Every structure is written in structure tokens, then in C-alpha cells.
């Protein structure tokens, strides 16, 4: 089992809300460690590489700042030029589009969070996913770039844009720090309700449709 979790697939507990509303605190997320490559178990030595992360995928990686295992969404890939203007993303000079998010996703959050944030479906090309934003004046956190992403580097952001320690804080993430692609919530417990199971979040794909 330990060998399986090291080299093939793992499940990770999510302790923070940086990926809300896609991933909530208490979710257990399944990570495919064979999505991009095969590594020697318990090491970072790569035996074979067959794919690279693409924009919009949710990945796990070790932070270049403190080596903590994080989960974020890939926004910038090698060769991309990324900018943000008052929380709106621009990819290669093309603005992301923002549409209405399904109300059922918003209602997963408590009323305090619902009233403090605005919610959208952010779309980059054919890729779309939920994001939540807190209306605020422009600052260095919601305005940056343009940044050209160098080879073997990736720009990561949390879906909870104003409450995420992502590439705006830790910098770009090198390819060798990425450990796998997250694709499913295996199960979930509610920390605020005595760890009661959230049955509606069991075996739930992370892909937004």
C-alpha cells in the first residue's frame, strides 16, 4: 500500500480553503501519480515522462518556499504570457471570460462566505472552472504581470483567488516539483459539524461541467 501511494496514486486531505469552491476543507482528493511520469518510489528520480500538466488541471506539488505539499490549479504553462488586472486573467494577451456559476456550488459554502464573495465560472479557451473573488481595490495580489513562463516552470493559482498562497507568493513552480494530477474527491467530512460525512461529495469528479 505504501509503495502504491508513493508511485501510482495517493489521496490527500485538504486542510485549507484555497481551492474553494472546487475543493472544500475536509475533502480527501485522489491524486494520479502516473498522470505525467513514472518515478522511483520514495524518490524524485524520474524513470519515464510521457506528459506534462496542461492549463486548468489541478495538481499537487511541493512548494519552492517551504517544501509543503500544496494543491492548486495550473494557469500558466511554459511559453505562456500571464497577467492579472483587478482579478481578471489574461493568457497570451487574451482575457479570460467569466460566466454565472451554478447556485448549488455556491450553496456548499456558509452564508458568511457567500455574502463576502462573488462567484464565477472562469473560462480559458475550452477550459472552465469555478472561482470565488472578494471585491476589493486593486493591489499587488490581484494585479501582476505580464509574466512570460520559462521552460519547465508553471504558474499556479487557487480557485479562492483572494485566500490562496500560490505563485503570487511562492513564485513559479518547477516541473520536477509536481507530484500528480488531482481528479476526484474520494470522500469528505465537515470540520464544522463534528466531522460528519458530506455524502454528496463522495466519489465526486473535480472537473467542472
Where do the language-model regions lie?
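Hydrophobic membrane-insertion alpha-helices, especially the h-region
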Residues: 1-7
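Soluble "head" domains of membrane/secretory-pathway proteins
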Residues: 10-13, 21-209
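A short acidic/basic microdomain associated with nuclease active sites
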Residues: 16
